[in-house]
């Protein structure tokens, strides 16, 4: 029997306490956590395998590869570019999952404000398999509105991101 690793959640973003939460996961054979990680942290590749992201920028310099503490911005789900900040960054290693989390914010009126934590976990599994888990908690009125849409655009969008990421890692 095995126990799987989980996302590390700051109190503010605990699943079920915000206005919108989704979780997506894939487990595939024939790839490693290192294969996936390279594609995930390189934002210059995102638009080649995920069509729900645009306008990626690094207003304080750095990039396009994400690193611990870096600030960046990107547009997604019809929102203008969100101010994002990497708050967790752990490269996958033997017996250690890769962990990447960023906060993203949209400022403005209460009707416009959005506060997000998007977390990723990338880990090697026995038998030459890799597991990729992505979860996101959103807080704010735009998040509450997004949560009521069917089909769920965030759930489907993140699944498309996972599928594209796995396809890019397999190239």
What role is predicted for each listed range?
Residues 68-79:
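Short, well-structured hydrophobic secondary-structure segments
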Residues 6-10, 65-70, 99-106:
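Short Pro/Gly-enriched beta-strand edge/turn motifs at strand-loop
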Residues 5-6, 131-133, 137-171:
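A conserved amphipathic terminal alpha-helix motif
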Residues 25-29, 57, 73, 85, ...:
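Generic structural detector for well-ordered beta-strands
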Residues 1-63:
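Hydrophobic ligand-binding cavity/cleft-lining segments
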Residues 35-40, 46, 70-72, 86, ...:
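Hydrophobic pocket/interface hotspot
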Residues 66-70, 123, 128-132, 143, ...:
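A structure-centric feature marking long, well-folded core domains of fungal metabolic enzymes
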Residues 48, 77-129, 137-139, 168:
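Hydrophobic-ligand binding "helix-grip"
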């Amino acid at each position: 029997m095995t126990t799987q690793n989980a996302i590390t959640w700051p109190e503010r973003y605990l699943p079920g306490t915000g206005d919108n939460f989704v979780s997506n996961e894939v487990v595939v054979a024939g790839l490693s956590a290192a294969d996936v990680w390279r594609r995930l942290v390189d934002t210059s590749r995102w638009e080649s395998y995920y069509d729900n992201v645009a306008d990626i920028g690094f207003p304080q310099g750095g990039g396009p590869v994400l690193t611990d503490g870096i600030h960046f911005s990107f547009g997604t789900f019809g929102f203008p570019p969100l101010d994002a900040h990497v708050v967790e960054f752990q490269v996958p290693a033997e017996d250690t999952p890769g962990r990447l989390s960023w906060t993203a914010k949209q400022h403005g009126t209460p009707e416009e404000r959005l506060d997000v934590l998007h977390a990723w976990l990338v880990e090697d599994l026995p038998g030459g398999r890799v597991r990729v888990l992505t979860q996101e908690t959103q807080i704010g009125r735009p998040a509450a509105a997004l949560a009521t849409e069917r089909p769920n655009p965030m759930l489907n969008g993140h699944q498309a991101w996972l599928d594209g990421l796995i396809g890019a890692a397999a190239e």
